[in-house]
């Protein structure tokens, strides 16, 4: 009985150790992933008022980000992310 208890404890500890080495459960939250179409439509209206680019009806184009615009889903803390995101200068 004592051997099976020790074996169980070793298995639990190894499971915790190797489980913590795996991929993180929560992925990095990117601004734009959780916006609804109402927010996107509001942005499109604001950009349309300024004469800039208008966002597609689905919201797959560019959004205002800080001083300019950037690809939808790439704006974080009023800055466009660098990797895999196109940046556009404001007009």
Swiss-Prot record:
Disulfide bonds: none annotated. GO terms for cellular component: extracellular region. Contains 3 disulfide bonds. Residues 22-50 form a propeptide. It comes from the Eukaryota. The cysteine framework is VI/VII (C-C-CC-C-C). Belongs to the teretoxin M (TM) superfamily. This is Teretoxin Tan6.2. It comes from Terebra anilis. The lineage of its organism: Eukaryota, Metazoa, Spiralia, Lophotrochozoa, Mollusca.
